[in-house]
């Protein structure tokens, strides 16, 4: 059952946030949505962390006119995996993004102009520190769980290591403790596509650059899929409207990348795309520690990991490595490898497969106290 119509909320914090870079950001606005009701002892709160280009609109619709529900609608609502009859679910837009939270497209109160490239470089850890301010605002001392895939999984890891006393569990899907050189190189090529678009104007554009961002998003879509899913979805089919020997004729997979790339331009700010890509590349759970083992020694809550066989962006061995280290430290951890052809996007699509395991995990967490 759907959660129905949901209104986005926002809160502005006048306090300044000291970032990992040493720079100061403030005031900070966070956009967020909530689903369900917070119980009397405030023990049923779940934070869902979104991925790179996601937003706070996790489930339901913001108006009757919306044609699509939130990005993970299938798992949120009465009787669903995140049962809103039992849980209070929160999803906030990360700082650096462009869906209502403070980012490069926001107005710098000191200048009265958009930040653009004067916006400071942010990290996933900075995002989580801002989320902690939101929990304080909502009067929530401790989360039942924090759950997320991809960059959302990185946020879950940061909660587990940086705020170990504020969570009872963490669930991380299709994620990594640090992106590989291959993942960084793909983001680098996406950046070049934007940097070489003359309409980007070194971040001082008035109208969102079109071609550079569309190409960058197309590169991203390739990493979200897999060889098997591309065969299943497109094969070698040629666009029926194009002639086979038309020089500019397209295979269906080309048309898909073009369509999704240019649609993305209408919904996402280019500078935000660049800043969040940088945050992904910089991510390292062990940042500030001698090793990943030292970082994970701070973990107190059980962590449940999910990896997907065809995910080549953050392949399963990277998740398994984290689970192995946590196990060696005597930390409560689960690692599940799910057979899937969907590639990195499997964390959004395989919910029927992982839902029973998540339910069992959360039931154990709730019974533990």
Swiss-Prot record:
Enzyme Commission code(s) on record: 2.3.1.31
Location of the active site: 150 (nucleophile), 311, 344
Chief place where the protein resides: cytoplasm
Domain of life of the organism encoding this protein: Bacteria
Gene3D superfamilies xref list: 1.10.1740.110, alpha/beta hydrolase
Assembly and interaction partners: Homodimer.
Protein name (Swiss-Prot/TrEMBL): Homoserine O-acetyltransferase
Organism: Geobacter metallireducens (strain ATCC 53774 / DSM 7210 / GS-15)
């Amino acid at each position: 059952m759907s959660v129905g119509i949901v209104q986005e909320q926002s809160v502005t914090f006048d306090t300044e946030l000291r970032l990992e870079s040493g720079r100061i950001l403030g005031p900070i606005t966070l956009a967020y949505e909530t689903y369900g009701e917070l119980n009397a002892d405030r023990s049923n709160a779940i934070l869902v962390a979104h991925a790179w280009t996601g937003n706070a609109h996790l489930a339901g619709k913001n108006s009757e006119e919306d044609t699509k529900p939130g990005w993970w609608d299938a798992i949120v609502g009465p009787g669903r995996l995140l049962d809103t009859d039992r849980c209070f679910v929160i999803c906030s837009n990360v700082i650096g993004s462009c869906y209502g939270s403070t980012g490069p497209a926001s107005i710098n109160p000191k200048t009265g102009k958009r930040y653009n490239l004067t916006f400071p470089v942010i990290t996933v850890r900075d995002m989580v520190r801002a989320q902690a301010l939101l929990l304080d605002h909502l009067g929530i001392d401790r989360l039942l769980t924090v759950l997320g895939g991809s960059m959302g999984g990185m946020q879950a890891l940061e909660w587990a290591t940086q705020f170990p006393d504020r969570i009872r569990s963490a669930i991380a899907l299709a994620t990594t403790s640090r992106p590989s050189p291959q993942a960084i190189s793909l983001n680098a090529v996406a950046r070049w596509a934007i940097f070489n678009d003359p309409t980007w104007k070194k971040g001082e554009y008035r109208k969102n650059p079109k071609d550079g961002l569309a190409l960058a998003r197309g590169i991203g879509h390739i990493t979200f899929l897999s060889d098997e899913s591309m065969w299943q979805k497109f094969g070698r089919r040629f666009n029926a409207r194009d002639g086979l020997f038309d020089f500019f004729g397209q295979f269906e997979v080309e048309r898909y990348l073009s369509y999704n790339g240019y649609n993305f331009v209408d919904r996402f700010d280019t500078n935000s795309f660049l800043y969040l890509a940088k945050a992904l590349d910089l991510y390292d759970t062990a940042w500030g520690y001698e090793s990943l083992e030292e970082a994970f020694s701070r973990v107190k809550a059980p962590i449940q990991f999910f990896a997907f066989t065809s995910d080549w962006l953050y392949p399963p061995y990277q998740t398994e490595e984290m689970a192995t280290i946590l196990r060696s430290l005597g930390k409560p951890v689960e690692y599940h490898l799910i057979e899937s052809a969907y590639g990195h996007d499997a964390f959004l699509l395989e919910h029927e497969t992982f839902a029973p395991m998540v339910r069992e995990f959360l039931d154990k967490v709730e019974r533990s106290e």
